[in-house]
Amino acid sequence: MNKNKIVLAYSGGLDTSVAIAWLKKDFDVIAVCMDVGEGKDLQFIHEKALKIGAIESYVIDVKEEFAEAFVLPALQAHAFYEQKYPLVSALSRPLISKKLVDIAHECGATYIAHGCTGKGNDQVRFEIAIAALDPTIEVIAPVRDWHWSREEEIAFAKENGVPIPADLDNPYSVDQNLWGRANECGVLENPWNQAPEEAYDMTVSPEEAPDRPEYIDITFEAGVPIALNGKVLSLANLIIELNQIAGAHGIGRIDHVENRLVGIKSREIYECPGAITLLAAHKEIEDLTFVREVSHFKPILENELSNLIYNGLWYNPATQAILSYLKETQKVVNGIAKVKLYKGHVQVVARQSDNSLYDENLATYTSADSFDQEAAIGFIKLWGLPTQVNAQVNKKGVV
């Protein structure tokens, strides 16, 4: 009897490995793993999926697409959820969903499965994205639906010949891509516990970072970082290199108690050395090149966009409309930011741009000053006129 095909988002971990063994009883399982920049060799995942029982197994390198189509808009939007979290995991989910749907179409599959639990954000992100891309596809979430304990999963794995991951005793749950690393669980679940050094991987402790600062130049063209210290790189490779450089100085550690979409609070440890450095540099070039009105209005949309992405609404029309506006603003974001990295701190210490709106002759207090100070008298009178009229009408007799 021919089975229906199901495309599984496969990580190689216990949950999705057990899912293959479970699903293959009723489906032909097609395992798909996306390389979004974990920095690991994922070939073993391809072989493991086939060994467990998948009929096909894909490992797809999507680092460049992830950087260009998802990370870049977030960088240009200065996207921080709750002003702290640069949306590390949230940014990869719409791309992973898109690839799952594409492969489902290619293989004639009408089902997609993921390994998310029922209390996280990712189940929402995957299922809403898949529904937006193809509402006819049915999504199955084995881990959420089983209600199995960890012990029951391990027992099932042993009974069915599923390899047990070597790091099963690791107390942490980690997700990593180009844009950073997210870590939760274990001792981190108590917000009073300081995160131990073992919870970090991409960054050195700021106390152990070099005693001398390092200066780097980041070049932007139409809002896109195109070169690091004068060396032109693809966006993905620039981020990878910057992760190494900034991570060595303890840059990008974030300890955040955040409000999850599903209604609970979660304590997360993030490491985003490249992201935090790029975000600081990009903001400074914007400050140099934007007119005041764009500088003041853009953050309103940035905050709304951050919430939309975090909440799994990348493919919502509101998200796409905001992204279109933000892309339009980037035409003038050209220049070089000189960044100082020192013991966990990022500081842009110099910047230049051919589109700079900073006029030194207008800003100076020296004899080279070209600002017409006499014009200020009339400006103040007109600017303050509504306030003056209000006082004359409504504050009579007020001391």
UniProtKB/Swiss-Prot annotation:
GO terms for cellular component: cytoplasm. L-aspartate binds at T117, N121, D122. Pfam families: Arginosuc_syn_C (PF20979), Arginosuc_synth (PF00764). It is found in: Cytoplasm. Keywords: Amino-acid biosynthesis, Arginine biosynthesis, ATP-binding, Cytoplasm, Ligase, Nucleotide-binding. Pathway: Amino-acid biosynthesis; L-arginine biosynthesis; L-arginine from L-ornithine and carbamoyl phosphate: step 2/3. It catalyses: L-citrulline + L-aspartate + ATP = 2-(N(omega)-L-arginino)succinate + AMP + diphosphate + H(+). L-citrulline binds at Y85, N121, R125, S173, E258, Y270. ATP binds at A9, Y10, S11, G12, G13, L14, D15, T16, S17, G115. It comes from the Bacteria. It is an enzyme of class 6 (ligase). Its EC number is 6.3.4.5. The keyword ATP-binding applies. Homotetramer. NCBIfam families: argG, PRK00509.1. Belongs to the argininosuccinate synthase family. Type 1 subfamily. This is Argininosuccinate synthase. It comes from Streptococcus uberis (strain ATCC BAA-854 / 0140J). The gene is argG.
